[in-house]
A protein has these predicted regions:
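Residue-level recognition of the GNAT/N-acetyltransferase active site
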Residues: 80, 113
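Conserved acetyl-CoA pyrophosphate-binding loop and the N-cap/start of the following alpha-helix
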Residues: 83-92
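Acidic/histidine-enriched, beta-strand-rich ligand/metal-binding domains
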Residues: 75, 82-84, 107, 119
C-alpha cells in the first residue's frame, strides 16, 4: 500500500526524537544534542517536515533562516534513508520555496555535497559563477 504524507511546519517535543533520528544518520548533524537541536529549531524562521501518515513518522525535514526580503538560506535538507527516491526531497524543498517567508525573497541559497548538485539544479538552483568563496570562522 503506498504511503501518504502530511506536511508539518513545526517540530515539537513530541516529534523531536524523530528529528534526532534523522540527524543521527547524517555526517553534518550526527553530533547534535537535543538541547542544541531545540535551540536551532527555535532560531529557525521556517521549519518544514514531512510525515508518513501510516506510522506518523517524520521522514523528511528542512529549515530556513531568512530576512524575508533579500536572502533565505536552506539548512538540513534530510530524507530518511528508507524513503529516498520517492520525491520527498523535492517535496520538502518545494514546500520551503512556497512558504510565505521565502517565496518573495530575492535569492535562496543552500549548501550541498557535489553529488547532489544535479538534484538541486533540476529545481532551478545553480552554482554561483561570480567567484564568490564561502568563508567560515568557528567561534
Amino acid at each position: 500500500m503506498p504511503s501518504t504524507y502530511r506536511v508539518i511546519e513545526s517540530v515539537g517535543d513530541e516529534r523531536l526524537h524523530q528529528l534526532m533520528e534523522l540527524y543521527r544518520h547524517e555526517w553534518w548533524t550526527n553530533n547534535r544534542t537535543i538541547e542544541h537541536t531545540q535551540a536551532i529549531l527555535k532560531g529557525s524562521d521556517v521549519v518544514i517536515g514531512i510525515c508518513d501518515e501510516a506510522d506518523d513518522r517524520l521522514v523528511a525535514f528542512a529549515r530556513v533562516l531568512t530576512d524575508r526580503i533579500a536572502r533565505a538560506f536552506i539548512f538540513d535538507v534530510i530524507v530518511a534513508a528508507d524513503r529516498r527516491g520517492r520525491g520527498l526531497g523535492r517535496r520538502v524543498v518545494d514546500q520551503v520555496l512556497e512558504h510565505p517567508a521565502v517565496k518573495s525573497v530575492e535569492l535562496v541559497e543552500l549548501y550541498c555535497r557535489p553529488e547532489l548538485v544535479p538534484f538541486y539544479e533540476r529545481m532551478g538552483f545553480s552554482s554561483p559563477d561570480s567567484g564568490v568563496v564561502l568563508m567560515r570562522r568557528r567561534l
